[in-house]
Design a protein with these regions (language model features):
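Loop/turn-to-beta-strand initiation segments
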Residues: 28-30, 99-104, 180-181
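Glycine-rich, flexible N-terminal cofactor/catalytic loop recognition
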Residues: 2-83
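Short Gly/Thr/Asp-enriched flexible loops that form oxyanion-binding sites at enzyme active sites
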Residues: 113-129, 195-199
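General beta-strand structural signal in soluble alpha/beta enzymes
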Residues: 59, 134-137, 184, 210
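Short active-site oxyanion
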Residues: 50-57, 129-133, 181-182
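A contiguous loop/helix-start segment that scaffolds small-molecule binding in enzyme catalytic cores
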Residues: 4-12, 19, 27, 181, ...
Length: 307
């Protein structure tokens, strides 16, 4: 059940609308405009002001963008701009900018040129000395990162991995020593295979955050170890639906931490000669003071390597 906006919010929105109306939108500029990643009300008032002012919109999918702007009450000429025609579309856009038109550049969802078409258009416009204006807004990678609780030496946006297995596995191996939080996008039909490959590349104990359908009705954010992730995902087919952001915690750079974990691995290797995985993890936790769940994941990895 929805509740009406409070009088305060109504007044505030009217005030913000007046502020937006007073803003200047220079002619002959390309507006790189972020659109919602799922929830329509996540669009900014400034973005709506740009959509009202522009002469045309360069977009990835004209049908999708046409429906989106219609929802906000706009009708604008659309310029098809996707990965197969981006260079040609850039020239059309540059010509219109030189004639003083205002052009918005959007992707299907989120911020353009972030794992989506748009970078070549922006590069071409800047190369010609024309103006590019970013209009801030949603980005699935940043939204997922903010809700992950993972920290490291910054973060590294990877986007989509190669679709071929050998190339994918090679890319993961190249990233395994990175201390940054790694941010990936993945499609539903590949997500289980990708996470299984991540477990093999990064080890069972590394944590992963699986974020799907962000800002939408069935949004789900789940954090666990890579040892647990494939089983969690496979346990419910609904968990494999939608659009995914996958975040992997960075590799430890601390020498003391590495020494502790190396010692724990040696201890677990000995304990597993006589104990079950669970018993070995419990004993190692008492001896080392490390967290039992991480030791369990490490013991499971050692046991898997033996089998």
């Amino acid at each position: 059940m929805t509740s009406p906006l409070s009088p305060y919010l109504v007044t505030l929105l009217k005030s913000l609308a007046e502020d937006a109306a007073a803003q200047r939108f220079p002619a002959g500029a390309l507006y790189v405009l972020a659109t919602p990643i799922g929830n329509l009300v996540d669009i900014s008032i400034r973005a709506l002001g740009v959509l009202e002012q522009v002469d045309a919109i360069a977009c990835e999918d004209t049908r999708h963008t046409g429906q989106l702007i219609k929802r906000y009450g706009f009708s604008k000429p659309l310029i098809s701009t996707h990965q197969h025609n981006e260079a040609a579309a850039a020239q059309k856009i540059i010509e219109r900018l030189r004639n003083g038109d205002r052009i918005a550049l959007v992707s299907d969802a989120g911020t353009p040129a972030i794992s989506d078409p748009g970078a070549r258009v922006v590069d071409a416009v800047l190369t010609q000395g024309l103006t590019v204006v970013p209009i801030a807004g949603p980005s699935a990678a940043v939204v997922a990162l903010s809700a992950s609780g993972l920290s490291g030496e910054g973060f590294q946006f990877v986007g989509f991995l190669p679709t071929k297995q050998a190339q994918r596995d090679s890319a993961l191996q190249a990233l395994k020593e990175s201390a940054a939080v790694l941010v990936f996008y993945e499609a539903p039909h590949r997500v289980l295979d990708t996470i299984t490959a991540m477990r093999e590349a990064f080890g069972h104990q590394r944590r992963i955050v699986i974020a799907r359908e962000l800002s939408k009705l069935f949004e789900q954010i789940h954090r666990c170890s890579l040892s647990e992730a494939p089983a969690w995902l496979a346990a419910d087919t609904d968990r494999q639906r939608g659009e995914f952001v996958l975040l992997i915690e960075g590799a430890s750079r601390g020498g003391q931490d590495n020494e502790q974990f190396n010692e724990a691995r040696r201890l677990l290797t000995l304990l597993l000669d006589e104990c079950s995985v669970s018993q070995a993890a419990a004993l190692a936790a008492k001896i080392t003071g490390l967290k039992k769940n991480k030791l369990y994941a490490m013991a499971l990895e050692i046991a898997d390597q033996r089998s």
